[in-house]
Amino acid sequence: MIELRNLSYTYGTAEEPSLKNINLKVKKGELLLVTGHSAAGKTTLALAMAGILHHEIGGKIEGNLSFKNRDIKEFDGIKELSRHTGMVFDDAESQLIFTTVEEEILSGLENRGYSGKEIQRRLNEVMELCEIGHLKERAPHTLSGGQKQKVALAATLALDTEVLILDEATAELDTEAVRKVFSVLKRLKEAEKTIIIVDHNIEDFLEIGDRVVLLEKGEIKAIKSPADFAAVSEDTDLTSKSSKKEYSCSQKERQPVISIKNLTQRYGEFNALDNLDLEIRSGELVAILGENGSGKTTLVKHLNGLLRPYSGNVSVKGLNTSLTPVNELVKHTGLVFQNPDNMLFEDTVEAEVAFGLNNIGITGSEAGDAIARSLELVNLKGKEKVFPRHLSRGERQRLAVACVIAMRPELIILDEPTTGLDAEESDRMMQLMKRLQLEGHTILMVTHNMQIVKDHAERVIRMASGKIVEDSANGACNSFKRNIKCVEEKCAEGGAIV
């Protein structure tokens, strides 16, 4: 189906190749899993197999790539290739350009010239499969990250292409949604579709995979069966080596840093937050869980003034967020967005970090020291002059964190902090958060990653339908342990927990 022969690729302004001498054959009906560390070349390989490198991005390409025994360069661009290959990008938001969810799905179908009856059949089918029927009239920009991924997946599935490429396409989905995607992919494989899954965490799909390709620094390090990969994964450098945290039952008296009373937020007629109350104390490390669309991101956007309450009150460090300018709030609160690309717009890595510092009056040598420290903390030292868009998704995630911690806000909020990071990098990120907590920072993390919740969180808040439905607060250590155990048991039973 797809064959790469001695393929090497270098982005236009890059000095080092992102792919080196790749030789790979993907058979018709195969489900191929591609994994590796951040910046290993996974996304670049996916873009190559979709024809996007050759027909859209350009750069230096050596070697050959063929699709169905035809050189990729012979196709009439993406217009022709997209009839055979569908791809869900690691940044689902970049695929969503229409005013409603329904229009996102209809646009591709209408461009294919299907009859009205067939269009409606496919629309209804993928909306049911991806469980987004209730979002039909919603504007994509109002959706959560996980909901956006569902819409991008639905729009791609509706086209029923021979090849489906998923690049970190489940990274922001809750447990139940990932389970649903697994079922859909299993059915597509039985229908002899060719499926390529690119992800740091492929464990959820090993059961239906045929082969695992392990990339390292742009080269194929190994190709294994799923069984062989699973057998050795605990001994590879992809696996986190951290020990689990010990829960402390003792807490010093902590002062409230966040106080929320009767908070309601609406998108049109939809209540994203519903009369919510919450208090966060100084020095806590809190995990916020919930299904896609439960209100997690909407909640944290109120803490730095990106959203103002529809009704109710939000106070941060005694400041009413409805009355305090954003440039004052960011001195106290740093928010790392769910999608790091929404934070990155400068020409170099160091300029990205400098931007926030300059906005709060930190310049000169003081800014230089802060930039150097933050980049070293996130393992990006040496990339100061790199164009941020040339970084991998995981590196961009770390850069976004560097931009926030450089300003040293007391409250650090991370919306899906481990998206795009492999297990080792995820652990390194959380060790950094623990270090910052010990320095006196308060940490809030919105996450679906139950392992980091189990290993690092002191308090767990679970949301559903814009409300807080569980909170292991008030220093109840035994209650907290039971809460974690309950969450794990529900996950094992197939419940929609996160």
Swiss-Prot record:
Membrane topology according to the record: Peripheral membrane protein
Gene Ontology MF terms in the entry: ATP binding; ATP hydrolysis activity; ATPase-coupled transmembrane transporter activity
EC id: 7.-.-.-
CDD domains reported for this sequence: ABC_cobalt_CbiO_domain1
Keyword field: ATP-binding, Cell membrane, Membrane, Nucleotide-binding, Repeat, Translocase, Transport
Signal sequence coordinates: none
One cellular-component annotation, GO: ATP-binding cassette (ABC) transporter complex
Binding-site residues for ATP 1, renumbered to this chain: 36-43
InterPro entries per UniProt: AAA+_ATPase, ABC_transporter-like_ATP-bd, ABC_transporter-like_CS, ABC_transpr_CbiO/EcfA_su, ECF_ABC_transporter_ATP-bd, P-loop_NTPase
Family annotation (SUPFAM superfamilies): P-loop containing nucleoside triphosphate hydrolases (SSF52540)
Role played: Probably part of an ABC transporter complex. Responsible for energy coupling to the transport system.
Family statement drawn from the similarity comment of this UniProt entry: Belongs to the ABC transporter superfamily.
Protein name as catalogued: Putative ABC transporter ATP-binding protein MM_2387
Source species of the chain: Methanosarcina mazei (strain ATCC BAA-159 / DSM 3647 / Goe1 / Go1 / JCM 11833 / OCM 88)
